[in-house]
């Protein structure tokens, strides 16, 4: 297909995989005007509770939506996850030109890998995993955001600036940071061992 609009919709598989290969855009936004009988906002959801989600498309718009599976893999030019959730019971991998995760959550129970050619905007967002977290980006804006590994290492690399003003960078084991410049004003960093 070219485009897929799943606004306030549900795409799922109880025991299998979900694969979406689009030449256009994936819209998984939550339309705040869509409410259930109790008045709760219906979240657009793409889920494979016991399987894997593979999404390969031009743009992913998951504003306020949920993408969840045992393993979640996204490959796109632009990923917009503002106030959305991208997660997995095991691993999450995202490969994109840009990722906007403002007020959003990207979380893996095991390992998380985010590769962004241009900018990762994680203002007031969370990019985290229980296992190892690997982030490679052209630049990282983590103002008031959180980038961390609960039980393993955080490997954060940027070809440009990492802005961590009022942000949180943490790892249970190693915290590895490589960048052209690091703005670390008013921050919290926790680790067993830090290498900057």
What are the language-model segments listed below?
Residues 1-196:
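A composition-driven surface/loop motif
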């Amino acid at each position: 297909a070219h485009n897929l609009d799943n606004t306030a919709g549900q795409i799922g598989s109880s025991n299998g995989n979900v694969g979406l290969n689009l030449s256009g855009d994936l819209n998984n936004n939550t339309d705040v005007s869509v409410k259930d009988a109790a008045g709760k906002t219906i979240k657009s959801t793409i889920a494979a509770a016991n399987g894997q989600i593979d999404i390969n498309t031009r743009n992913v718009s998951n504003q306020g939506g949920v993408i969840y599976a045992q393993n979640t893999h996204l490959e796109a030019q632009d990923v917009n996850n503002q106030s959305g959730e991208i997660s997995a019971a095991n691993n999450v991998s995202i490969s994109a030109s840009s990722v906007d995760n403002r007020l959003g959550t990207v979380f893996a129970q095991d390992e998380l890998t985010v590769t962004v050619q241009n900018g990762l905007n994680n203002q007031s967002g969370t990019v985290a995993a229980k296992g190892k977290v690997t982030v490679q980006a052209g630049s990282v804006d983590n103002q008031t955001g959180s980038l961390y590994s609960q039980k393993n290492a955080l490997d954060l690399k940027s070809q440009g600036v990492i802005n961590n003003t009022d942000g949180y960078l943490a790892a249970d084991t190693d915290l590895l940071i490589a960048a052209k410049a690091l703005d670390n004003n008013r921050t919290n960093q926790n680790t067993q061992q830090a290498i900057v």
